[in-house]
């Protein structure tokens, strides 16, 4: 696991009040992690603040798994 994933994993676990080990790249926000639409909105906002990036709403709506968010954030940090 790289540092970026670890940061994302910690943030998601804290926001959803779950164990970090439940957050994997292939975890579905809704099915595996139990996030509802409000949780997802709050996660996107927290990721934007923490990572110093802007995630367009249309892109955020495409985030189904942690990998989706990770890959987008990684692409913005180059």
Swiss-Prot record:
It comes from the Bacteria. Keywords: Cytoplasm, Fatty acid biosynthesis, Fatty acid metabolism, Lipid biosynthesis, Lipid metabolism, Phosphopantetheine, Phosphoprotein. It is found in: Cytoplasm. Its main location: cytoplasm. One of its GO terms (molecular function) is acyl carrier activity. Pathway: Lipid metabolism; fatty acid biosynthesis. This is Acyl carrier protein. SUPFAM superfamilies: ACP-like. 4'-phosphopantetheine is transferred from CoA to a specific serine of apo-ACP by AcpS. This modification is essential for activity because fatty acids are bound in thioester linkage to the sulfhydryl of the prosthetic group. The keyword Cytoplasm applies. Coiled coil: none annotated. Signal peptide: none annotated. Carrier of the growing fatty acid chain in fatty acid biosynthesis. Residues 2-77 form the Carrier domain.
């Amino acid at each position: 696991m790289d540092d970026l994933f670890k940061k994302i994993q910690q943030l998601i676990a804290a926001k959803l009040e779950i164990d970090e080990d439940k957050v994997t790249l292939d975890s579905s926000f809704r099915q595996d992690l139990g996030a509802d639409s409000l949780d997802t909105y709050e996660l996107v906002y927290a990721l934007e603040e923490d990572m110093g990036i802007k995630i367009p709403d249309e892109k955020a709506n495409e985030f189904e798994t942690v990998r989706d968010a990770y890959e987008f954030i990684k692409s913005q940090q180059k």
